[in-house]
């Protein structure tokens, strides 16, 4: 998780493109030189969509289809891109049950996280999210995954995740925060000796190989 411009997408730069399927839910492309040669429809490792149903279908394909078994990393960038797009579609509804549609938004977000937990064991799912820093009724400040809708806020998406990393830019340097008071970031016990590391998802994946 991280604010816009904190290096979330850039942190994916060292993933092996031949073993990675990238779902671009923000529809803005990736942000390192030469990415279009690595990730494209022709290579069957890139798709741009802001539809929950399409993302769910792609997850099923990567998980089960024989011609996708070489894929070891699945990136969803970002969950917020899906939620915001769905929110805009609901707001544009001229008819229908908007209350039900808002419930569907929360259900779709929760279902996507749950589906990620059920995919094959040799597939690492990386879900990028925006972060927000809020103050609760007691004045306690916390940084967490930004969600759309009160139902998802109450559910706490991080509770379904084994690892939550906070991408930040401090003093001109991009890095990952692995553990910090007042945040929901977390890594398995013993996986790191420090509370931060370089902005590179492969460092995290390597550290988690035994978990």
Q: What are the roles of these predicted feature ranges?
A:
Residues 1-75, 80-81:
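Conserved P-loop
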Residues 125-198:
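Phosphate-binding/switch region of NTP-binding enzymes
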Residues 73-155:
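P-loop NTPase motor core
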Residues 11-14, 65, 116-119, 154-158, ...:
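A general structural signal for short secondary-structure junctions and capping/turn motifs
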Residues 33, 86-87, 171:
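Hydrophobic alpha-helical membrane-insertion segments
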Residues 194-211:
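Charged phosphate-binding loop/patch that engages nucleotide di/tri-phosphates or the phosphate backbone
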Residues 17-20, 120-123, 159-163:
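Short glycine-/polar-rich loops that comprise or flank the Walker A/P-loop
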